[in-house]
Amino acid sequence: MQNNEIIKPAKYFSELEKSILLALVEKYKYVLECKKSDARTIALKQRTWQALAHEYNSQPSVSLRDFKQLKKCWENIKARTKKIMAHERREKVKRSGSPLLSSHVLDKEKISSMLPEQLYFLQSPPEEEPEYHQDAAAQESFAVSNRELCEDEKEFGPFPVCEGTSQPEPSCSAVRITANKNYRSKTPQEGALKKMHEEEHHQQMSILQLQLIQMNEVHVAKIQQIERECEMAEEEHRIKMEVLNKKKMYWERKLQTFTKEWPVSSFNRPFPNSP
C-alpha cells in the first residue's frame, strides 16, 4: 500500500461503533437534544458534535468518521426507534415477544431515555401499573374500614346530634365517593408535578452541561495561548543564541587575524637604543 493512499471508512456502522456512539451521545445528550434553536445553541451543538467525533475517533477498533457521519447515524437510530415504538404501541405487543425490537433496535430503553419528551406519547407506561394497584389497594382497605364503620353504626345506633346544629351526618357511601374522587384527582396532580420536576431537572442539567462545555473551551483556549507563548519564547531564544554564536565566531576570527599580524614573539624583542 502506498503512503499517499487514503483509507476510506467503512460504509456501515458496526454494533460496537453504534454502542460507542450511543455512550458518547448519552454523555452530551443535554446539549445535543436541547430544543433551543438560537444561533448560540446551534453553534454549541456543532462544537459538541466535533468534540464527540474527536472522542469517537480516539477509541480503538473504530473507523474514522467525521461529526456529520456520526450525527446522521444518530438521527437514523432515533427515527428507527420512534417508528418501532409507535408500532409497539399500536400493536400492543409485549416487549419480550417482539422479534422486531430484538433484531433492529439497539438499546431501545437507553435511546428512549435520551428523548423523554419526544417519546412521551409513544412508549407504553409500565410505571403507572404499581400506582394503580396501590390506589386500588388503598381504596379496598378504605372500603373495608367503611363497612366496619357502618356495622358499628348499625350496632350502636346513630350518634346523638348536638343541639343548635342542623347539619346531616354523611353516610358511608358519600364518604366512599368523596375518598374515591380524592384518589382520582390526586394521581393526575402527582403525575403533572412529577413531569414538571423532571423537565426542570433536565433544563438544569442542560444548563450545567453547557457551562461545562464553555469552561472546557475557555480552558482549551488558555492552553493553546500558553503553548503559542512558549513557542514564541523558544523561537526568540533560538534567534538570540544564533546572534551570540555569530558574534562569538566573528570575534574568534578577528582574534586569529590579529594574532597572525601581530605574533606574540614580536612583543618580546628589545626596543632599539635611542641615539
Curated annotation (Swiss-Prot):
Q: Which organism is it from?
A: Mus musculus
Q: Which family does it belong to?
A: Belongs to the MSANTD3 family.
Residue span, Myb-like domain? 13-78
What is the official name of this protein in its record?
A: Myb/SANT-like DNA-binding domain-containing protein 3
Q: Which Pfam families match?
A: Myb_DNA-bind_5 (PF13873)
Q: Which residues form a coiled coil?
A: 211-247
As given in the record, the signal peptide range reads none
List modified residues, type Phosphoserine: 96, 98, 274
Which InterPro entries does its entry note?
Answer: Myb_DNA-bind_5
The residues joined by the cross-link Glycyl lysine isopeptide (Lys-Gly) (interchain with G-Cter in SUMO2) are 154
Q: Which UniProt keywords apply?
A: Coiled coil, Isopeptide bond, Phosphoprotein, Ubl conjugation
